[in-house]
Amino acid sequence: MNSGYSFFKSFFYSTKNPFFKLIKFEWRFLLYGLLMSLWSSFGQTFFISLFSLEIRQELDLSHGEFGAYYSIATTVSALTLLWLGKLSDTQTVHRLSVITLISVCLSSLFFSTVSSVLMLIFGLYLLRLSGQGMMYHVYSTAVTRRYNLMRGKALAICGLGMNLAEATLP
């Protein structure tokens, strides 16, 4: 019984294990990445699709029409990200994170007021660009730059935010 406890203690609390050493000393930055990953959900397909029935009913759209508008918004946001992604080379992580968080909040607020097809396309564009695009880009770039030897482990920990979001969001 005692040897099992000592194994558990040495495995989880020892700083000799590189994975747990990373968590112990870098928990703040990893939490940042995990939360950014979680909050990117507001622009992810799994989250937006939860409301597609109500959106289609409100705007009298077929599945195909909604899918076409969604594809247009996604494609245009991806093209915009090619240009906007350069900001991660010139802006600080803190500044870009704050701007991205504010843009996700404003995009969500705008999306809640959608009353026409044009507003829908623009709202989807904003959500896809700020949430799915920039939010993911900002945290993954920051984590990739910060860690050399533990890059994969750090990205895996931060990526758990998406899994957490899929499990807990409506």
Give the label of every model feature segment.
Residues 102-115:
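C-terminal ends and interior cores of transmembrane alpha-helices
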Residues 133-147:
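Intracellular juxtamembrane helix-capping segments at the cytosolic ends
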Residues 80-92:
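Helix-to-loop junctions at the C-terminal end of transmembrane segments
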Residues 74-82, 167:
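Residue-level signature of mid-helix packing/kink "hotspots" within the transmembrane helices
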Residues 94-97:
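Primarily marks hydrophobic transmembrane alpha-helices of the MFS/SLC 12-helix fold
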Residues 38, 118-134:
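Hydrophobic core of transmembrane alpha-helices in multi-pass small-molecule transporters
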Residues 150-170:
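Glycine-rich segments within core transmembrane alpha-helices of 12-TM secondary carriers
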Residues 24-47, 126:
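Pair of pore-lining "gating" transmembrane helices in MFS-fold secondary transporters
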